[in-house]
Amino acid sequence: MEKAKIHHIPFKLSGPAIEKNTKLTFKAEDKNGIWNIEDIKGKKVISLFPAINTKICDMQTQQIAKLAQEHKNVTFISISTDSVKKQEEWCAAKGLENVLIVSDDKYKEFQTKTNAYIPRINKLTRGFILLDKENIIQEISLNIELSKEPNYTLLDKWIK
């Protein structure tokens, strides 16, 4: 997938999306500073989204928080290009303390390595990436239409 749409308006991604069976390593930033995917052990789900203060991104991140409660054997990571401050404010406003949310704004490694990035608007696309304990991509699902929620049923099937 090299294109995404927002309300049917096409946008080019930064390149061809990363593929299954690829090792994904990256650093990002969280409220404590530098955050590294390699510090997280076990199976992981990365939930990527464009902007936390929008309706669909809000719903997606809250749904991920629910899934994290149901699937304790999986680490759920939410990532966007929002600033850490904006992410923290959102979490505080929603009362969500169990959400692992990181920012790709400073280091830009996630967007560079996955190409799940829309340069024209400086936002990530929407979707999920499932990693095994070695950080090898097992499944990937990126939305073509960003104004729609991702496929939670597919994600739930993957992690069972």
Regions found by a protein language model. Give the residues of each.
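Chalcogenol-based redox active-site neighborhoods
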Residues: M1-K160
